From Swiss-Prot:
Residues 1-17 form the signal peptide. This is Hemolysin transporter protein HpmB. GO terms for molecular function: porin activity; protein transmembrane transporter activity. Interacts with the cell-bound hemolysin. Necessary for the extracellular secretion and activation of the hemolysin. Probably a beta-barrel protein. InterPro entries: Hemolysn_activator_HlyB_C, Polypept-transport_assoc_ShlB, POTRA, ShlB_POTRA, TPS, TPS_OM_transporter. GO terms for biological process: killing of cells of another organism; monoatomic ion transport; protein secretion by the type V secretion system. It is found in: Cell outer membrane. Keywords: Cell outer membrane, Cytolysis, Hemolysis, Ion transport, Membrane, Porin, Protein transport, Signal, Transmembrane, Transmembrane beta strand, Transport.
Length: 561
């Protein structure tokens, strides 16, 4: 009977969102599960964002064709007007916006202005190979202007890293548009091993163009190994992190990446192991991705009368589609849709904790804006996530007190990331500000809460945990990168702040802040990062529940092969 009471009490702790931060932290299974799922999703988002930014690193095509003009003269031309043929890609509005010719004494300057305006209308729509050809005057004395709008005759220069069929689908025989050409180049250059440039050559047919691609390809594989003490007290401080990626493994301009994070201290009694796999493939303006992650943990928790073994695992699989619906040399706007299935299993001394072990399926719709600004980059992502009943997702469990989690929740998330370089006192500084927030009217399962005290949120927390259904945090970092002989040295300071609120918690909004300072030293492919951080909770804690977070010293060493 005593065992049953202890177990029911534990289940209640896991299932109720109105607990205080420290009460939740005392039994950290749900924290481990949430951290594992959110860390793997963060790794996936960072890879996608990195590939998107990589597209804007390379200069896109910039072509300004020179129109064929008549030799300038002040004399009147022996014509009474003009007629235009061959136009199919311009609208009536485009044609009506052209400057009218004079009724009397048409000069070469008037004709040249008309040709330039026609060429400019094509360029405004992105048709970069359109040109105007002169025809002999007709029987009415009208000079002919014939628009050769141009089309793609063929594409040359593809290699294993540049699959022209997927990068430029259905482009052959179509009008050559700058946006289509830029999009294909951007998709090719999203792979770090590619540096693709393009030349447009005249084809053998009238109006035909040959797209000739050149690629300065580097090594397609990348391997990064790191060791740090960013782990948790319960499951292990020191971790070995490995990231391996390969560009175009199937010759489809595709991408595959594998991450593995494993704790190393006392692996037989306490551990946290996480693995994430991502695969993506382009098709014109679309990028399709599939991903999966698996993590497992184990640690021992001291209770009042005994020590228990807590362990569990999480599995996450999903598919995602991104579509770049607007782009230029300085910005990309993307729509994305993602379907994710999550399975969480938590155990208390071989007894499964059903209320903290849900199966969830979510569908997420988002819009992303990536903008290169003067001396900086701004990225914003807004998304709506809805839990659905697909793939065996569980129904919302019945809770007698009515304070249970909603397994059919809806939540809104906003993420912004701003990098800005600026000069001060004849030195260059870098400022980075990151905001993440979420809101849900529903009571979320614990794995969907927003946590302020994770290492990727407010810096400086080690023992306290603070999370909730709604909230947000802001991370600000000011750094000063400089070179010393062959070393790149970057000292930094950071200030973070955030608040969360749990549904049903009478305490309302609870917050915290963190202060940090760090130093990054890089020599060729090796990096050493040191950070000192201190976090504080900004709400009243009772003496029995009070947690004092010590000042943290974090160390990370990494090497890129």
């Amino acid at each position: 009977m005593k065992k049953k009471v202890v177990l029911l009490t534990l289940l209640s702790c896991f299932s109720t969102s109105g607990l205080s931060a420290n009460e939740t932290g005392n039994l950290g299974s749900i924290s481990e599960s949430r951290r594992a799922l959110q860390d793997s999703q963060r790794e996936i988002n960072q890879l996608i964002e990195q590939n998107r930014y990589q597209q804007l690193q390379e200069k896109a095509v910039n072509i300004s064709p020179t129109p064929t003009l008549i030799t300038e003269s002040e004399h009147c031309l022996p014509i009474k007007g003009v007629y235009i043929q061959g136009i199919t890609l311009l609208t009536e509005k485009d044609l009506n916006s052209l400057s009218p010719l004079p009724d009397q004494c048409i000069k070469s300057a008037d004709i040249n202005r008309l040709v330039k305006e026609l060429t400019q209308r094509y360029l405004q729509h992105g048709y970069i190979t359109a040109r105007i050809q002169f025809l002999r005057p007709n029987q009415h004395g009208e000079l002919g202007l014939y628009a050769i709008e141009g089309f793609v005759e063929r594409i040359e220069g593809g290699d294993r890293g540049v699959n022209t069929t997927l990068l430029f689908p259905r482009i052959k025989g179509q009008p050559l548009k700058l946006a289509t050409l830029d999009q294909g180049l951007d998709q090719a250059n999203r792979l770090q091993s590619n540096k693709v440039t393009v030349d447009i050559l005249p084809g053998t047919e009238l109006g035909g163009s040959v797209i000739k691609l050149s690629n300065q390809r580097k090594s397609p594989w990348h391997l990064n190994i790191a060791s740090d003490n960013y782990g948790q007290k319960n499951s292990g401080r020191w971790l070995i992190r490995t990231n391996a990626s390969l560009d175009s493994p199937l010759g489809l301009s595709d991408f595959v990446s594998l991450n593995a994070n494993i704790t190393t201290d006392n692996p037989n009694t306490r551990f946290n192991r996480a693995y994430t796999l991502l695969y993506s493939i382009p098709y014109g303006g679309f990028t399709f991705s599939s991903f999966g992650s698996y993590s497992e943990y184990q640690f021992h928790q001291k209770l009042q009368t005994r020590t228990v073994n807590l362990y569990g695992d999480t599995t996450q699989v999903g598919i995602r589609g991104d579509y770049a619906f607007s782009r230029s040399q300085k910005q990309i706007d993307t729509l994305n849709i993602q379907v994710t299935h999550k399975r969480i299993r938590n155990y208390f001394s071989q007894i499964r904790l059903d209320l903290s072990s849900p199966k969830l399926t979510t569908i997420e719709l988002g819009i992303n804006h990536l903008q290169i600004i003067p001396n900086g980059v701004l990225s914003t992502n807004l998304s709506v996530e809805k839990a659905v009943g697909w793939f065996g997702a569980e129904e919302t469990p019945y809770i007698a007190n009515g304070n249970g989690n909603d397994y059919r929740f809806t939540k809104v998330k906003l993420f912004t990331n701003w990098y800005q370089r600026f000069s001060l006192w004849h030195s260059t500084f870098l400022f980075n500000s990151t905001f993440l927030g979420q809101y849900s009217h529903d009571t979320l399962p614990g794995v969907e809460w927003l946590s302020l005290t994770d290492k990727n949120a407010i810096r400086g927390f080690d023992q306290s945990t603070l999370s909730g259904d709604n909230g947000g945090y802001l991370r600000n970092t000011l750094s000063y990168p400089y070179r010393l002989n062959h070393f790149s040295i970057t000292p930094r300071i950071g200030v973070d702040i955030g608040q969360v609120k749990q549904h049903g918690n009478y305490k309302g909004w609870q917050g915290g802040y963190g202060l940090s300072s760090g130093l990054n030293i890089q020599y060729q492919q090796a990096q050493l990062d040191l950070e000192v951080a201190k976090g504080e909770l900004l709400y009243h804690q009772t003496n029995s529940n009070k947690t004092k977070d010590p000042t943290q010293l974090l160390v990370k060493f990494s090497y890129l092969f």
